């Protein structure tokens, strides 16, 4: 039997996934079923774009429910390792890009809760991979799709 994939995440990230799952199961699923009922009332299903659209949305919602359920069931909560001097999963790292000194901060999380717009990057991302295990004042070369970037870590929290 194949081993299930483990999804490292923070407690906060797991809670957000649980909230989304609950919403999909209790609200969105019912809305989609109602849309399907209404679309069926329009008659001929072979040329009924409302019905097709509602069925596509239903497939998406059910797929997302399955995905979220799997991620939550196989979640591994990131424990605080106690050492705030080393970049690790769950830590927020602030660095300056060299030589211009532009400061950036990211929290390194598991891929299930990554959201770059909220400053949360996946531990599988090029930036995170380069920073993991490093310490304050370390200078790091980061390989990105746009080329190399040189940074210096200024804070870990």
UniProtKB/Swiss-Prot annotation:
Instruction: Please give one Gene Ontology molecular function term for this protein.
Output: RNA polymerase binding
Instruction: From the UniProt record, give one GO term of the biological process aspect.
Output: DNA-templated transcription elongation
Report any Pfam family annotated for this entry: GreA_GreB
Q: Which domain of life is it from?
A: Bacteria
Transmembrane segments in this chain: where? none
Name the Gene3D superfamilies on file. Transcription elongation factor, GreA/GreB, C-terminal domain, Transcription elongation factor, GreA/GreB, N-terminal domain
Keywords recorded for this protein, A-Z: DNA-binding, Transcription, Transcription regulation
Q: Which NCBIfam families match?
A: greA (TIGR01462), PRK00226.1-2 (NF001261), PRK00226.1-4 (NF001263)
* Family to which the UniProt record says this protein belongs: Belongs to the GreA/GreB family.
Q: Which PANTHER family match?
A: TRANSCRIPTION ELONGATION FACTOR GREA (PTHR30437:SF4)
What is the protein's known function? Answer: Necessary for efficient RNA polymerase transcription elongation past template-encoded arresting sites. The arresting sites in DNA have the property of trapping a certain fraction of elongating RNA polymerases that pass through, resulting in locked ternary complexes. Cleavage of the nascent transcript by cleavage factors such as GreA or GreB allows the resumption of elongation from the new 3'terminus. GreA releases sequences of 2 to 3 nucleotides.
What name does this protein carry? Answer: Transcription elongation factor GreA
Question: Gene encoding it?
Answer: greA
């Amino acid at each position: 039997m194949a081993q299930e994939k483990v999804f490292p995440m923070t407690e906060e990230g797991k809670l957000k996934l649980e909230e989304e799952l609950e919403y999909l199961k209790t609200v969105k699923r019912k809305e989609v079923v109602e849309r399907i009922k209404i679309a069926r009332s329009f008659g001929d299903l072979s040329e009924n774009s409302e019905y097709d659209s509602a069925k596509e949305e239903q497939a998406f919602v059910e797929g997302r429910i399955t995905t979220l359920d799997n991620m939550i069931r196989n979640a591994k909560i990131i424990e605080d390792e106690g050492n705030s001097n080393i970049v690790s999963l769950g830590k927020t790292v602030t660095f300056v890009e060299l030589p211009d000194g532009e400061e950036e901060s990211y929290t390194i999380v598991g891929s299930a809760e990554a959201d770059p717009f909220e400053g949360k990057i996946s531990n599988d991302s090029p930036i995170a991979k380069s920073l993991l295990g490093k310490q304050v004042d370390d200078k790091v070369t980061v390989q990105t799709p746009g080329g190399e970037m040189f940074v210096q870590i200024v804070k870990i929290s």
